[in-house]
């Protein structure tokens, strides 16, 4: 195996990413080297491409980016015992310390020392990515490669949707991006009664309809209260999944929640936006922030959803070779795509 590889690198502090030749990561005793077969573009990667304020504060340059992927193990460290060369795998993109209180209590997703693959350390937009053995997840044979490549965002959807009991509940999802759509599908499959998803992007609303979500609402043209009446809802929503990061959508969600309702918040909202806290208080709402995936309960659940017949393939709207990465980023930046999966092989 050569000691150099192709990778998408943030080589300069400006808009864009560049295909470069960089050294293959060195494998430590507890590490696993993975030959990447497919990788997907995340919203985080778009922030890095755009070199916005968050990226400028967060991303060291140069940096190999990307964290949504699947591949095959190419090499294992001398102390690795649970994985072997040739195994199909994906990986948890949050590297946790294992030493803090939350890690020691089995709550690694709450680690205050988390490092992000493709953010704080070299990522998976490359021919090879190196992860600690702890972070590597075996992919069963009945899970397709391209679906395994989007397990990171699917995990965000599963973690958010399953934060609260959904059986018999009416669920509102704000934001029909890929994660919002997958969250709505999980809610529907987990026993929710009514599942309503809102957005203002016609392409994403059409994608939500294509995937079989029953109640798809264009918030720019339809009044949510009217929709609720038309589908027989006499009270507010029991569970809210905020996936949009849009202040108007979040405010509308709070307004439409039933007393005692529960909201899981994944969408990253603009700093300092206002909500009516009196409604939160007098409705006795429960608000819960969501970041990443539970380690590794979320991974087991999302594998089970796929093995149980949940078809996520339509969420992937663009399948391209890695040399066309600019086209993939253009699709993501336009807002008129679902998931974009890039083939490295």
From Swiss-Prot:
Alphabetical GO CC annotations of the entry are:
cytoplasm
Q: Where does NAD(+) bind?
A: 179, 199, 204, 266-268, 290-291
- One Pfam family this chain carries? ADH_N
Please give the SUPFAM superfamilies that the UniProt record associates with this protein.
Answer: GroES-like, NAD(P)-binding Rossmann-fold domains
Q: What is its EC number?
A: 1.1.1.103
> Where is the protein situated, by its record's location annotation?
Cytoplasm
User: Which Gene3D superfamilies does the record cross-reference, listed alphabetically?
Assistant: Medium-chain alcohol dehydrogenases, catalytic domain, NAD(P)-binding Rossmann-like Domain
Catalysed conversion reaction: L-threonine + NAD(+) = (2S)-2-amino-3-oxobutanoate + NADH + H(+)
| Gene Ontology biological process terms in this record | L-threonine catabolic process to glycine
Cofactor(s) this protein requires: Zn(2+)
Protein family (similarity comment): Belongs to the zinc-containing alcohol dehydrogenase family.
What is this protein's name?
L-threonine 3-dehydrogenase
Q: Which gene encodes it?
A: tdh
């Amino acid at each position: 195996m050569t000691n150099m590889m192709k990778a998408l690198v943030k080589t300069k502090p400006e808009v864009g990413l560049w295909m470069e030749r960089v050294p293959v990561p060195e494998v430590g005793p507890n590490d696993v080297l993975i030959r990447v077969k497919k990788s997907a573009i995340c919203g985080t990667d778009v922030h890095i491409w755009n070199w916005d304020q968050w990226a400028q504060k967060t991303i060291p340059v140069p940096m190999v980016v990307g964290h949504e992927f699947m591949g095959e193990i190419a090499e294992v460290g001398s102390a690795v015992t649970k994985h072997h060369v040739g195994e199909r795998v994906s990986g948890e993109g949050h590297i946790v310390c294992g030493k803090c209180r939350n890690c020691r209590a089995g709550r690694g997703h709450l680690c205050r020392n988390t490092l992000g693959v493709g953010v704080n350390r070299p990522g998976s937009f490359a021919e090879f990515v190196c992860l600690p053995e702890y972070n590597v997840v075996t992919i069963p044979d009945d899970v397709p490669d391209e679906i395994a490549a989007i397990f990171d965002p699917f995990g965000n959807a599963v973690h958010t949707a399953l934060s609260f009991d959904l059986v018999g509940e009416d669920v509102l999802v704000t934001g029909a991006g890929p994660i919002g759509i997958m969250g709505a599908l999980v809610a529907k499959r987990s026993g929710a009664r009514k599942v309503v998803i809102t957005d203002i992007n016609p392409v994403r609303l059409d994608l939500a309809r294509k995937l079989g979500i029953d109640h798809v609402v264009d918030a720019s043209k339809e009044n949510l209260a009217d929709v609720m009446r038309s589908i027989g809802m006499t009270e507010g929503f029991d569970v809210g999944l905020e996936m949009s990061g849009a202040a108007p959508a979040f405010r509308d969600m709070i307004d439409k929640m039933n007393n005692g309702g529960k909201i899981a918040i994944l969408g990253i909202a603009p700093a300092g936006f206002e909500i009516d806290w009196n409604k939160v208080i007098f409705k006795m709402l429960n608000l819960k922030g969501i970041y990443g995936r539970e380690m590794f309960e979320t991974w087991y659940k999302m594998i089970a959803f796929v093995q149980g017949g949940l078809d996520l393939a339509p969420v992937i709207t663009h399948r391209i070779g890695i040399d066309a990465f600019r086209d993939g980023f253009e699709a993501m930046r336009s807002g008129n795509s679902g998931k974009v999966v890039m083939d490295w092989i």
